Amino acid sequence: MKPSERRKARRLAVQAIYSWQLSGNNIADVEHEFLTEQDVAGVDIAYFRELLGGVATKKSQLDELITPFLTRPLDEVDPVEKAIVRIATYELTFRKDVPYKVAINEAIELAKAFGAEDGHKFVNGILDKLVARNR
């Protein structure tokens, strides 16, 4: 598997988690929708499924890890940035095979692509603090 396949999986997962957060739809339905209606060429489908399912099933645990580092309530965080931070926190917590620098860098790049103007700074700040506490 090429690193770019995981990058594409993360990118698709951010979009799917964003959709799930806003719609409240069943995560299996969101997964099906994205796998059938999006271009999944070159995407690590297994990793996409793991990120999507992992964030959905461990949302409360992930949010507990994230919340201490927020300067505002979690429900006030931009939904795109929330999706990105949840994915990165999942990787940092449950995918020890993913180097923390990779997880953070990928999250920053996703925030630059999808987030608000300074969203990448917010994402970086949260994840740096999370890693520092857990190392």
From Swiss-Prot:
The keyword Transcription applies. Involved in transcription antitermination. Required for transcription of ribosomal RNA (rRNA) genes. Binds specifically to the boxA antiterminator sequence of the ribosomal RNA (rrn) operons. The gene is nusB. This is Transcription antitermination protein NusB. Keywords: RNA-binding, Transcription, Transcription antitermination, Transcription regulation. One of its GO terms (molecular function) is RNA binding. It comes from the Bacteria. SUPFAM superfamilies: NusB-like. The lineage of its organism: Bacteria, Pseudomonadati, Pseudomonadota, Gammaproteobacteria, Alteromonadales. GO terms for cellular component: cytosol. Belongs to the NusB family. GO terms for biological process: DNA-templated transcription termination; transcription antitermination. It comes from Shewanella halifaxensis (strain HAW-EB4).
